[in-house]
């Protein structure tokens, strides 16, 4: 019956000329249900009459059969807290782990940190640099003890050629002539397969004579190249050089024209330093008796040194058709240079480089 009476009164609200409803009357018809455990609900009660008084809400609710029933109570929902502190799979915006996948660093309780990841390009570059350093060191170790290649056996030459080919394939400076900061400077010869240097290398293997150093100085500002050689003996050291000019023919090739040779005055040693034994054609020769008679000879050597010191170097022009040559740089970095000329292969290290430390 309550349902029927409510249905009969409902059209009065939507009649053509309804009676105005005051705010106080409307407010009295709205109440908050105290039985909802989670959210308040709004209930509207039909007007009882023209006076606008609201009916007292009943605590019982009638169903469609007219029987009273208690209002249903919604079960309370429990929320499971995350197992980790702070949570790994969600942030304050409700986003999951996909937003920061791969960048979360579990540091326990506290503020999470984000680890910096190296780019693939940087890792690849580091790998290439390490590979080149390993190849350079292997090449230097292979040529060590070969007297600049003069005493290198066939298997050693083959191994050197393999290392050189790998370095040339990974050359970090494809246009060395256009890189003066790398090309300029003094370069010390480590190994050569040049037939033109064989007589000089052979002289360094003579008894009481040692080939100390062969070097090449390049100056791209003046377009000059100077090849220098130093020999030493128990009595003195000798230095001579050959100067040349060059023209750039390509980013890797220069054309060299030799001008003149220069012989420096010998540097006489204050004390004669003879070994006790020398090897001559496979025979050991003792120099003991000679060492005992060197006392008076040292005074003569000291006088000669004072006479020739301060003398100007001897200049020797280089005539003939063989005054021109070409040189291609096939590998260049801050401390190693590989060049090929019409006379063969040259492996050089920059003066002061750690590659010269053996």
Curated annotation (Swiss-Prot):
InterPro entries: PAP, PAP/fibrillin_dom. One of its GO terms (cellular component) is chloroplast. Residues 1-47 form a transit peptide. Its main location: plastid. Transmembrane segments: none annotated. Keywords: Chloroplast, Plastid, Transit peptide. Residues 48-114 are annotated as: Disordered. It holds the Pfam family PAP_fibrillin. It is found in: Plastid, Chloroplast. Belongs to the PAP/fibrillin family. May form together with other plastoglobulins a coat on the surface of the lipoprotein particle. The coat may contain receptors for attachment to the thylakoid membrane as well as regulatory proteins that may function in the transfer of lipids to and from the thylakoid membranes. This is Plastoglobulin-1, chloroplastic. It comes from Pisum sativum (Garden pea). The gene is PG1.
